[in-house]
């Protein structure tokens, strides 16, 4: 929006051309989202408290979590508002990728909002029934996958790129739609599973978004893409602005979500942020890198799958409790220790993911 206005004003004052620089708009988008979240936070928390929209806590979980009962939830709404407003302000609204990632993010956010609303407002512990949750997730995920498949400008945009190898490009054909669906839906649910401790999910999300911003910037730049031997995806550079708004909004939310949390993001935030990371990774053709950088999300998801599978097959549990962060809590780790160590792991994994840009 502001880019369009700047282009008009540039006819009268050339200084406005500075807003055509992508790096500047990434920075401004990040700062705008950060400030919006910091401004919205107290107001959102106050309204959630007034309406008694508080987190319910399971009796069979770690005893330390009982004190969290009643903490305002659904705070992810402020993250989505900050992301949407900042992206619309600083992004190039003629770029179809911008509209696609916003649609996917807000669509998954709507699913999470309905789930949260039924749980905390209507006092229905099941929330949105699983079959309907996965139906709508699948509808949005497949819709995005088909759209990307039909609008691909070159074969490489629907191929699997293998990191560390310059020339390993695997044509996917229609399987691209299946892979894209699983990346978006899987990433969404993985972040949701990780969102169980104060600040545990949001900081890794911020870090991964920052990593993807670098990939998006490079993928949309002809010189960088050729030099780094990564796919050139025309228009993907604008996703760096979107990723910047995720990082900014996430840091703003962390101001209130850090231990001890004043607010939780709820499914409205977790499902949306996970889907956002997934769809960006798909567009810039870095699904495998997302798997690396989002290793904490992967560990949490795999721990649940192993726990459920082991219990059904043998009647025994592998972990004291799943997802994995609860296992460490029940081993006696204080909550802040679990959180910060998972953050440290994510920093290392994001750096490893970025290293694949050069090691080829």
From Swiss-Prot:
Entry GO CC: plasma membrane
Pathway info: Cell wall biogenesis; peptidoglycan biosynthesis
Positions of transmembrane segments: 21-41, 73-93, 94-114, 145-165, 168-188, 199-219, 236-256, 263-283, 288-308, 339-359
UniProt keyword list: Cell cycle, Cell division, Cell inner membrane, Cell membrane, Cell shape, Cell wall biogenesis/degradation, Magnesium, Membrane, Metal-binding, Peptidoglycan synthesis, Transferase, Transmembrane, Transmembrane helix
GO biological process, one term: peptidoglycan biosynthetic process
GO molecular function, one term: phospho-N-acetylmuramoyl-pentapeptide-transferase activity
InterPro entries assigned: Glycosyl_transferase_4 (IPR000715), PNAcMuramoyl-5peptid_Trfase (IPR003524), PNAcMuramoyl-5peptid_Trfase_CS (IPR018480)
Designated name of the protein: Phospho-N-acetylmuramoyl-pentapeptide-transferase
Organism: Chromohalobacter salexigens (strain ATCC BAA-138 / DSM 3043 / CIP 106854 / NCIMB 13768 / 1H11)
């Amino acid at each position: 929006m502001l880019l369009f206005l700047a282009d008009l004003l540039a006819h009268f004052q050339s200084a406005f051309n500075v807003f055509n620089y992508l790096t500047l708009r990434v920075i401004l988008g990040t700062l705008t989202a950060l400030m919006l979240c910091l401004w919205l936070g107290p107001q959102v928390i106050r309204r959630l408290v007034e309406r008694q929209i508080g987190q319910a806590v399971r009796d069979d979980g770690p005893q330390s979590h009982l004190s969290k009962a009643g903490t305002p939830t659904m705070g992810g709404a402020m993250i989505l508002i900050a992301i949407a407003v900042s992206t619309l302000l600083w992004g190039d609204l003629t770029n179809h990728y911008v509209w696609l990632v916003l649609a996917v993010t807000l669509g998954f956010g709507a699913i999470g909002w309905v789930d949260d609303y039924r749980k905390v407002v209507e006092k229905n512990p099941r929330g949105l029934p699983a079959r309907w949750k996965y139906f709508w997730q699948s509808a949005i995920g497949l819709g995005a996958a088909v759209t990307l498949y039909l609008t691909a400008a070159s074969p490489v945009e629907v191929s699997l790129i293998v990191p560390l190898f310059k020339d390993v490009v695997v044509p996917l054909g229609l399987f691209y739609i299946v892979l894209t669906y699983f990346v978006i839906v899987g990433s969404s649910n993985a972040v949701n599973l990780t969102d169980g401790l104060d600040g545990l999910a949001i900081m890794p999300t911020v870090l991964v978004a920052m990593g993807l911003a670098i990939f998006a910037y490079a993928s949309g730049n002809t010189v960088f893409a050729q030099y780094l031997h990564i796919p050139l995806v025309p228009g993907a550079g604008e996703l760096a602005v979107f990723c910047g708004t995720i990082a900014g909004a996430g840091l703003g939310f962390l101001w209130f979500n850090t231990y001890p949390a004043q607010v939780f993001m709820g499914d409205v935030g977790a499902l949306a942020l996970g889907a956002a990371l997934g769809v960006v990774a798909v567009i810039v053709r870095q699904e495998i890198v997302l798997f690396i950088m989002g290793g904490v999300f992967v560990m949490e998801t795999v721990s649940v799958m192993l726990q459920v599978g082991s219990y059904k097959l043998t009647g025994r549990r592998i972990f004291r409790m799943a997802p994995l962060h609860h296992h460490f809590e029940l081993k006696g780790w204080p909550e802040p220790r679990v959180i910060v160590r998972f953050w440290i792991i994510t920093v290392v994994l994001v750096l490893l993911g970025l290293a694949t840009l050069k090691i080829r």
